[in-house]
């Protein structure tokens, strides 16, 4: 009868109350139990008050209660019904697994981003190429325009030079002009002969065409007495002209250009006179003289080597940019754009 009453009384007590009673019967304090079980005093107190700490997993709580029961000599089988109520097993929360479609969606998004990046890169490259081509085309058109202008100027100058009328009525055959001087004095004939024949190699056909009428007029109009007197005066300037042609004075402002490839250029001196304007072929050279400073326009700077006052002119900055060179050669040989 007493055993059944004790069993009913134990069932009425909770797990925490039974552990507390057993501890008190053994004369142990909560501090002593906590030290033996290596727990906090607050944890022992929560177990005796049938509290389940929120920050403590149910598995650990059940283990602490079993250790506490062994310490105070209470069979674990008697505490199992109370453990189910005080520390029920909680289902572990499992994070939902990401589906394969999410990875495919992210991969698709990365693919679109990469496609957009490549598209932007191609657009930038295309715009850069278009800008370079337009600049190159503009330079070529400018060179072509300058070449056409120079060709038109040269053609107009040549037409003006060809339209000058020549007075052919005064030019006579050398055979007819040489016949009348037969009656002229011997000394006059001897002085005229070297004066006319000596400069012949040094002058061009145009000069011969101009000199011949005057010579014919002098021969036909000469009389024995005045011819001997006028012949030395007329013959004296000829050696002077010949000396001026054969021994030119070197100009310190001479501009020398050697060409390694076909190149268009235009050279103007300080007076605005165009010393040259047109196309120069490969292996050609120019030696120009005028009044400094010179203004130069060069279509292909890499194809020409310039010397001014005996010193080379640096065109590297125009060669690097591959542009039409516009520069001015001052008297101090300091090219300025």
Curated annotation (Swiss-Prot):
Q: Which Gene3D superfamilies does the record cross-reference, listed alphabetically?
A: lambda repressor-like DNA-binding domains (1.10.260.40)
Which Pfam families is this protein grouped with?
A: HTH_25, RodZ_C
Q: What is this protein called?
A: Cytoskeleton protein RodZ
Which family does the record claim for this protein?
Belongs to the RodZ family.
Locations of Polar residues compositional bias?
145-167, 208-218
Task: Recite the UniProt keywords alphabetically.
Answer: Cell inner membrane, Cell membrane, Cell shape, DNA-binding, Membrane, Signal-anchor, Transmembrane, Transmembrane helix
Annotated HTH cro/C1-type domain residues? 19-71
Q: Give the gene symbol.
A: rodZ
What CDD domains does this protein's entry cite? HTH_XRE
């Amino acid at each position: 009868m007493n055993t059944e009453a004790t069993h009913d009384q134990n069932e009425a007590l909770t797990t925490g109350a039974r552990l507390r009673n057993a501890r008190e019967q053994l004369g142990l304090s909560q501090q002593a139990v906590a030290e033996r079980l290596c727990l906090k005093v607050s944890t022992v107190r929560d177990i005796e008050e049938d509290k389940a700490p929120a920050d403590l997993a149910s598995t650990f709580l059940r283990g602490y209660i079993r250790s506490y029961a062994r310490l105070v000599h209470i069979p674990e089988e008697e505490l199992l019904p109370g453990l189910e109520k005080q520390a029920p097993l909680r289902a572990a929360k499992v994070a939902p697994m990401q589906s394969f479609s999410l990875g495919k969606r992210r991969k698709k998004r990365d693919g679109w981003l990469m496609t957009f990046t490549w598209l932007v890169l191609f657009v930038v490259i295309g715009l850069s190429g278009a800008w370079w081509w337009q600049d190159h085309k503009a330079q070529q058109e400018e060179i072509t325009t300058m070449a056409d202008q120079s060709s038109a100027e040269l053609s107009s100058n040549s037409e003006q030079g060809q339209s000058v009328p020549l007075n052919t009525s005064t030019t006579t055959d050398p055979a007819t002009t040489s016949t009348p001087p037969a009656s002229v004095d011997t000394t006059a004939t001897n002085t005229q002969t070297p004066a006319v024949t000596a400069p012949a190699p040094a002058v061009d056909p145009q000069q011969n065409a101009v000199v011949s009428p005057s010579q014919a007029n002098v021969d036909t109009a000469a009389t024995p007495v005045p011819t001997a007197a006028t012949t030395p005066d007329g013959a004296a300037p000829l050696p002077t002209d010949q000396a001026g042609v054969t021994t030119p004075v070197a100009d310190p402002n001479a501009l020398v250009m050697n060409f390694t490839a076909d190149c268009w250029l235009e050279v103007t001196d300080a007076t605005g006179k165009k010393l040259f304007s047109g196309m120069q072929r490969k292996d050609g050279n120019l030696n120009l003289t005028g009044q400094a400073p010179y203004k130069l326009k060069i279509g292909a700077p890499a194809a020409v080597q310039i010397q001014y006052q005996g010193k080379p002119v640096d065109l590297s900055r125009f060669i690097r940019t591959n542009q039409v060179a516009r520069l001015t050669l001052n008297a101090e040989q300091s090219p300025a754009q």
